[in-house]
C-alpha cells in the first residue's frame, strides 16, 4: 500500500523548483510611494449567490467604518424566484458586508508571478474584517469603476494590489476566494462565530407615530345665558373615521332654573317652564329673574335625574287664600317682628270677651259671603298677593337659599301660632261667656231659647260648610298633584300649614310652634308619607284632626243643651 506524501513546503505548494530565485521588494517599501497600497479583507460568510465575475465595491467611511457590497448573480436570483415563489421585488441583487479596519504594523505579502517566475514582497496597510448584514441594501446602486484597474493576482487568487499607497475611499477589488496572510482559503460555508455585533446603517427603526384621537371637548355654557331653551352638549357618537357627529340635544331644566320652576308652580302651571323663568299669566313681572350660573353637562344630567325623582315624590302646591295673604306680614321680617306682632295682637282676646255675641255674627257673615270662599281657590289672587322678598334671592347659592327658607318658615310658623293662640283664646272666652249668658237667660223666656237654638243651628251649618270646604280642597290638591309637580317642599308645606291653621274653627289647644318645628325639620326626607297623611296633618302639627274637631263641637253643643 503506497502512501502519498503531503505537500507541506511552500515550494511544493507553489510548484516552484529547487532553483534559486531573486526576491524583490515592492513599491510599498519605497518611502516616496503614494500610489500603491495593499489591504486584506476577511468576511464570515459568502453566500452561493455571489457573482464572482463582477466587481465589488468597498466604501471606507468615517471612524474606520467599512461597507463592502458584493453583487449577486442573476441566475441565483432566478433560482430563488422559482424555488421560494418570491416576486421580483423580493429578490436581493446585492450582498452587503459591514465592519471596521485597522492598520498593520509589520505584516507583508509575497506575490509570485507565474509568467516571469519573480517573487515580490509588499507591505500590508490595513486589515478589514466585515460581517454579512441581515438586511440587504436594495436601493444602493453598484458603483462601477470608470476605468479598469490592473490587478496582480497571486497563485491562489489573492488580491495583490491597487494603484494607491493609502487606502482609497472606494477600492475596486476583483472578486474571488479571499484569503488571509497565511494563505488559508475562506471559501468554506462554515460561519465564523464572533462576539462583536455590527450596526447596520441600512436598518431603520420605523417608529409609528400614534396620534391620539382628538375627541370634541364638552364646552361649558356661557356665563350670561340667553333666555332661550338650553340643552347640554351630548357626547359625540363613536365613528371609525373620527367624524365629529353629535346626537340631537334634548332641552333640560338645570339647577339654574329653580326660581323659574318655582314661579311656574305658583302661577298654577300657566307659566312656561324653560331655561329661564318668565312672568306669570296675569301680567305680573318676573320676581325672581333669570339664572346666571353655569354648570357642566354631567352636572346638568345628574340634576335632571334628581329633579325627575324629586317631582315624582313631591307634595302638591298648596294655594293660600286671599284673606290669609292680607293678614300675613312680609317674610323678610325678623323673629322679633313676629313676637312684636304677637304682643300687639294680645289685647284682641279681651275685646272678644266683652263681645261674646260678635263671633256668631261674624260666622254668619262668612257663611253668607261665597265670594270670599271662592277667593280661597283662585290662583289669580295668589299671584297678585305673592310676597316680594324672594326677588333678591336670584344670585344666592342653593344652600343659602334653603337655610333662609327654613328661617322664614320658622318665623311665619311662629307668627301663625301667635295668631292662632289669640283666636283660640278668644273663641274659648266667647264660648264660655255665651254658655254663661245662655244659662243665665234660660228662665227669661222663649226668646232666649230661640236665640240659642238659632246659634246651634248656625254652628252646625258652619261645621258642615267647613267640612265641605276641606273635602273640596283635598280634591283640588289631588288634581293639582297630577297636573303640576312641586320641587320645593318647604314653601308649599308652609303655605299648606298656614291655610289649615286659618281654616280651623275657633276651638283648640295651645301653641303649635314646637311640634310644627319638629315636624318641619323632618318633612324634607319624607315627602310621600306627609302627602298621604293629608287628613291627619292637624294631629302631626299639634292640632286636632277632623274627627276630633267634630267630636269637640258635638260635646260643646251637648254642654250648651245641658246648661239650658
Curated annotation (Swiss-Prot):
GO terms for cellular component: nucleoplasm; super elongation complex. Residues 438-453 have a biased composition (Acidic residues). One of its GO terms (biological process) is positive regulation of DNA-templated transcription. It is found in: Nucleus. Residues 274-283, 315-329, 343-387, 409-420, 463-505, 523-533, 546-564 have a biased composition (Low complexity). The keyword Iron does not apply. Residues 186-205 have a biased composition (Polar residues). Its main location: nucleus. Keywords: Activator, Developmental protein, Nucleus, Phosphoprotein, Transcription, Transcription regulation. Residues 297-309 have a biased composition (Basic residues). One of its GO terms (molecular function) is transcription elongation factor activity. The modification Phosphoserine is found at residue 215. Residues 179-255, 270-564 are annotated as: Disordered. Promotes transcriptional elongation by Su(Tpl)/ELL. Essential for development. PANTHER family: ELL-ASSOCIATED FACTOR EAF (PTHR15970:SF2). Belongs to the EAF family. This is Ell-associated factor Eaf. It comes from Drosophila pseudoobscura pseudoobscura (Fruit fly). The gene is Eaf.
Amino acid at each position: 500500500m503506497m502512501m502519498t506524501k503531503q505537500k507541506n513546503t511552500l515550494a511544493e505548494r507553489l510548484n516552484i523548483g529547487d532553483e534559486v530565485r531573486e526576491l524583490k521588494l515592492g513599491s510599498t517599501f519605497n518611502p516616496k510611494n503614494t500610489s500603491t497600497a495593499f489591504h486584506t479583507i476577511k468576511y464570515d460568510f459568502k453566500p452561493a449567490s455571489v457573482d464572482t465575475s463582477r466587481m465589488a465595491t468597498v466604501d471606507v467611511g468615517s471612524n474606520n467604518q467599512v461597507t463592502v457590497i458584493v453583487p449577486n448573480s442573476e441566475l441565483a436570483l432566478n433560482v430563488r424566484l422559482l424555488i421560494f415563489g418570491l416576486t421580483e421585488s423580493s429578490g436581493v441583487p446585492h450582498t452587503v458586508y459591514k465592519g471596521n479596519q485597522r492598520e498593520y504594523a509589520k505584516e507583508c505579502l509575497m506575490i509570485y508571478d507565474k509568467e516571469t517566475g519573480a517573487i515580490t514582497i509588499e507591505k500590508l496597510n490595513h486589515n478589514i474584517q466585515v460581517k454579512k448584514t441581515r438586511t440587504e441594501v436594495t436601493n444602493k446602486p453598484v458603483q462601477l469603476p470608470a476605468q479598469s484597474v490592473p490587478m496582480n493576482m497571486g497563485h491562489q487568487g489573492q488580491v495583490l494590489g491597487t494603484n494607491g499607497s493609502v487606502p482609497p475611499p472606494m477600492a475596486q477589488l476583483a472578486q474571488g476566494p479571499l484569503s488571509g496572510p497565511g494563505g488559508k482559503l475562506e471559501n468554506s460555508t462554515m460561519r465564523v462565530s464572533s462576539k462583536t455585533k455590527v450596526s447596520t446603517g441600512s436598518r431603520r427603526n420605523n417608529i409609528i407615530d400614534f396620534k391620539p384621537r382628538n375627541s370634541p371637548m364638552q364646552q361649558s355654557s356661557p356665563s350670561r345665558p340667553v333666555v332661550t331653551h338650553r340643552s347640554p352638549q351630548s357626547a359625540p357618537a363613536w365613528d371609525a373615521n373620527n367624524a365629529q357627529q353629535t346626537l340631537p340635544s334634548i332641552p333640560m331644566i338645570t339647577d339654574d332654573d329653580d326660581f323659574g320652576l318655582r314661579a311656574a308652580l305658583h302661577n298654577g302651571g300657566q307659566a312656561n317652564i324653560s331655561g329661564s323663568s318668565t312672568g306669570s299669566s296675569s301680567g305680573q313681572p318676573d320676581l325672581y329673574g333669570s339664572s346666571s350660573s353655569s354648570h357642566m353637562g354631567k352636572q346638568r344630567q345628574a340634576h335632571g335625574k334628581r329633579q325627575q325623582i324629586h317631582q315624582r315624590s313631591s307634595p302638591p302646591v298648596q294655594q293660600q287664600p286671599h284673606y290669609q295673604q292680607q293678614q300675613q306680614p312680609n317674610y323678610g321680617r325678623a323673629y322679633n317682628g313676629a313676637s312684636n306682632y304677637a304682643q300687639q295682637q294680645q289685647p284682641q282676646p279681651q275685646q272678644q270677651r266683652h263681645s261674646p255675641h260678635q263671633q256668631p255674627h261674624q260666622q254668619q257673615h262668612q257663611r253668607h259671603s261665597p265670594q270670599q270662599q271662592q277667593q280661597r281657590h283662585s290662583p289669580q289672587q295668589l299671584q297678585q298677593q305673592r310676597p316680594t322678598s324672594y326677588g333678591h334671592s336670584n344670585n344666592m347659592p342653593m344652600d343659602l337659599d334653603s337655610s333662609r327658607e327654613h328661617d322664614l318658615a320658622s318665623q311665619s310658623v311662629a307668627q301663625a301660632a301667635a295668631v292662632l293662640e289669640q283666636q283660640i283664646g278668644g273663641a274659648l272666652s266667647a264660648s264660655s261667656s255665651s254658655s254663661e249668658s245662655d244659662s243665665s237667660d234660660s228662665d227669661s223666656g222663649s226668646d232666649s231659647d230661640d236665640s240659642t237654638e238659632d246659634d246651634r243651628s248656625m254652628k252646625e251649618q258652619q261645621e258642615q260648610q267647613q267640612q265641605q270646604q276641606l273635602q273640596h280642597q283635598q280634591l283640588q290638591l289631588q288634581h293639582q298633584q297630577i297636573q303640576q309637580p312641586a320641587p320645593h317642599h318647604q314653601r308649599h308645606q308652609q303655605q299648606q300649614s298656614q291655610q289649615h291653621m286659618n281654616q280651623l274653627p275657633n276651638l283648640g289647644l295651645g301653641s303649635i310652634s314646637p311640634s310644627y318645628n319638629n315636624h318641619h325639620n323632618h318633612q324634607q326626607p319624607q315627602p310621600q308619607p306627609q302627602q298621604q297623611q293629608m287628613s291627619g296633618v292637624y294631629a302631626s302639627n299639634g292640632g286636632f284632626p277632623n274627627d276630633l274637631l267634630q267630636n269637640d263641637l258635638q260635646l260643646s253643643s251637648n254642654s250648651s243643651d245641658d246648661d239650658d
